[in-house]
Amino acid sequence: MSEISSCATQNHPKHATFEAALDKYRTKIAPNLCITGPLNTVELSNIVGLVTRERGEVPIVFIDYLQLLACGVTADQQFIDERLAITACVKGLREISNLYGSPVIALSSTTRKSYDSGKSARPNLAMFGGSSAVEYGFDSVLYLADDNDKPEWPYESPATGTPLKLVALKNRYGTLGESRLDFDGARATFHDRG
């Protein structure tokens, strides 16, 4: 972060690049973002509908994360039972996707049990906490895990960042598989180690 803040000073050699990136963010990215506090799926659906009507484009909905989405009647009325709340959230997100054709990407926690099982057993759909609705309600489920496996090929280059693997646990319209990645934390990017 200190490199970024130092680029903001006018005498820094990367200042022009920093200003260009900032300008691109201001003109292209920021006007297309809608970051909100806790919402229920009805309120979220209203926002998606408004964006679709005003912009003439269907937005992509990112939920960070599913267990924090407010799924009561209003944003401040949560269900008492977490399983019912998660089931209602998944159902509401599916309705938004079906109604507007909007892709929905939701982050979800996993059960505490799965923290240990992820080290030895293959990840599976049962590891998502709270409700089986996560298993059945989404078209695709991806899991990001540490990659402590041996290289698949003898000529595979070693990891240059944090070695991870992205595992497709469910893919309603395609095949399952995994991809080996490097995570570059300083740049918040993933690179395929394929």
List each language-model region with its residue ranges:
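NTP-binding/hydrolysis catalytic cores, primarily Walker-type P-loop NTPases
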Residues: 168, 173-194
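Generic structural "secondary-structure junction" signal
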Residues: 6, 71, 127-130, 183-185, ...
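Generic preference for hydrophobic/aromatic residues in regular secondary structure cores
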Residues: 31-35, 142-144, 181, 188-190
